């Protein structure tokens, strides 16, 4: 019986694909070597310990229907669209070795006619007249008895959109998380015009088989039916939840300020695990009472636009004469924290 397993996803849903990856990783036998090939529609994927409000322009993402997905590995934020091919290599220990999976990807690129090399901790680069350009980035995860290496190859990604979503708003955002280094990147279509996702998947598959001297039939994972994987439904529910994607952010502070016709407002939030642990409001409004009441209501509130808006509007009962001000405040806050 083959020790290899090849899975190819037909889904473009990042939460679905990451849930598939997680389920396979948890239940695979330690003797198995797995290759999973997939891609995501418009998504920002962040590392396990990253702060989405720091790393991403979450407001623009919401406007453009770009999803946020937190992966279980470390590393930085990346933008995925259908111009990316994603790969995951998994193996039990002691056999797991990320240099093997890296060499498989390099061999696949070489077979396609691209000479690339490993650079730094987790990048693959090609040499161009303008200098080295990144075509692949990776991240890794290890447990006591297994490990995985996953990454992306830039085929024909919209690099201008990459900058749109990975450059955060210029907010006064003092985070305890770390901002990722942005790398200079290029698409493989610049070197191989017309290269497709299917061709890249085939090349990686051939290099995978060649390395291990075995072949195996591909298992197609379809979004049309629930994958036959242990605990998939629970894993997908967690992967797609606000609590996982946003609520796992490291502690941070956020300062919002705005001037309205009725006065200036400064809001100071301390946020931990997606909840406001401290809220302070400063204002030169002639009627500060509703704002002072708001600070009390926001303590413990989820740091989510709809929840903050709800707390603002709840004050209308106690402060009906300030309806105009409270509605303006509510609209501004909801937009500012997206």
Swiss-Prot record:
Ranges for domain BPL/LPL catalytic: 29-216
Location in or out of the cell: Cytoplasm
UniProt entry keywords in alphabetical sequence: ATP-binding, Cytoplasm, Ligase, Nucleotide-binding
EC number(s) given by UniProt: 6.3.1.20
Major localisation: cytoplasm
Involved pathway(s): Protein modification; protein lipoylation via exogenous pathway; protein N(6)-(lipoyl)lysine from lipoate: step 1/2; Protein modification; protein lipoylation via exogenous pathway; protein N(6)-(lipoyl)lysine from lipoate: step 2/2
Binding site for ATP: 71, 76-79, 134
This protein's GO CC annotations: cytosol
Function noted in UniProt: Catalyzes both the ATP-dependent activation of exogenously supplied lipoate to lipoyl-AMP and the transfer of the activated lipoyl onto the lipoyl domains of lipoate-dependent enzymes.
Record's protein name: Lipoate-protein ligase A
Species of provenance: Escherichia coli O9:H4 (strain HS)
């Amino acid at each position: 019986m083959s020790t290899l397993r090849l899975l190819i996803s037909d889904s473009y849903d990042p939460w679905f694909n990451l849930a598939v990856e997680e389920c396979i990783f948890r239940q695979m036998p330690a003797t198995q070597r797995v290759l999973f090939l997939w891609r995501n529609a418009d998504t920002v994927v962040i590392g396990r310990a990253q702060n989405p409000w720091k790393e991403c322009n979450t407001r623009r993402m919401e406007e453009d229907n770009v999803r946020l997905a937190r992966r279980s590995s470390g590393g930085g934020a990346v933008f995925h669209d259908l111009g990316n091919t994603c790969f995951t290599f998994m193996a039990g220990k002691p056999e797991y070795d990320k240099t093997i999976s890296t060499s498989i990807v390099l061999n696949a690129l070489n077979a396609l006619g691209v000479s690339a090399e490993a650079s730094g901790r987790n990048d693959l680069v090609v040499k161009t007249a303008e200098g080295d350009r990144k075509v692949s980035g990776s991240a890794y995860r290890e447990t006591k008895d297994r490990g995985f290496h996953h990454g992306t190859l830039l085929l024909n990604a919209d690099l201008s959109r990459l900058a749109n979503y990975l450059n955060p708003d210029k907010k006064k955002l003092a985070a305890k998380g770390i901002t990722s280094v942005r790398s200079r990147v290029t698409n493989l279509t610049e070197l191989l015009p017309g290269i497709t996702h299917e061709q890249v998947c085939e090349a990686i598959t051939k290099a995978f088989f060649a390395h291990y001297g075995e072949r195996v039939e591909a298992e197609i994972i379809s979004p049309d039916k629930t994958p036959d994987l242990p605990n998939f439904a629970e894993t997908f529910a967690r992967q797609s939840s606000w609590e996982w994607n946003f609520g796992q952010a490291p502690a941070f502070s956020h300062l919002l300020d705005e001037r309205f016709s009725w006065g200036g407002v400064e809001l100071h939030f301390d946020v931990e695990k997606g909840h406001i642990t401290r809220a302070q409001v400063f204002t030169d409004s002639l009627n500060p009472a509703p704002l002072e009441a708001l600070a009390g209501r926001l303590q413990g509130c989820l740091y989510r636009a709809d929840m903050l808006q709800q707390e603002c509007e709840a004050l209308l009962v106690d402060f009906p004469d300030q309806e105009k001000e409270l509605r303006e405040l509510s609209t501004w806050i909801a937009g500012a924290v997206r």
